[in-house]
Design a protein with these regions (language model features):
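Short, acidic, Ser/Thr-enriched surface-loop or helix-capping motifs
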Residues: 3-5
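Glycine-rich loop-to-alpha-helix module at the N-terminal edge of alpha/beta enzyme cores
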Residues: 7-98, 108
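Rossmann-like NAD(P) dinucleotide-binding subdomain of oxidoreductase/dehydrogenase enzymes
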Residues: 99-173
Length: 173
């Protein structure tokens, strides 16, 4: 990874091949079998903890976004704040995943809609919003009971690694 700020090499990272990707897909499907059974408010609590971890790491992650992507420091902080804000929104959503109940044409019969998780969600993000777009999608998917596979921009791999480390620290609890 090279910084557009000064052209310096920041770090080198490995890229995934097709075989590794297939393993990730299988792991995501296994994780989905359990994650989908968690009640939405419990999933929301996990997302709340992710938001708290992001708050604790806001400055460092903001600096990394700024340096690796080329944004100003304030824009880097703003992008991390967007992640925190969507966590807060998703936590509220986790208690609002209710459906509708409606009358049917049949006597003494009612219909209802109910939300169900769908599975693995793929998230592809561009370099210009290396972390916020991922959070916008992942946090909502997680409270809805889905799991995510993230394909970040090859120009900002360190931002995605940092986010995964922060997120993993919460999921490991």
């Amino acid at each position: 990874s090279y910084s557009p700020v000064d052209g310096n090499r920041i770090a080198s990272v490995l890229t995934s091949d097709e075989k590794t990707f297939e393993k990730v897909v299988v792991k995501s499907q296994e994780a989905f079998k359990e994650w989908r059974t968690w009640p939405a408010p419990k999933r929301g609590e996990v997302v709340r903890q992710i938001g708290e971890a992001l708050r604790q790491n806001k400055e460092d992650l903001g600096k990394l976004v700024s340096y690796e992507m080329g944004k100003s420091y304030q824009e880097g902080l703003g992008e991390v704040q967007e992640m925190i804000d969507i966590c807060d929104f998703a936590v509220g959503l986790s208690r609002q995943l209710h459906g509708l109940t409606m009358h049917s044409e049949r006597p003494n019969h009612r219909m209802y809609e109910q939300w169900h998780p769908i599975g693995t969600v793929g998230i592809i993000t561009a370099f210009n919003f290396p972390v916020a777009v991922w959070a916008w999608n992942a946090m909502i998917a997680w409270v809805c009971g889905d799991v995510c596979i993230w394909k970040p921009s090859e120009k900002t791999p360190l931002c995605s690694i940092a986010c995964q480390q922060i997120t993993n620290s919460v999921f490991e609890k």
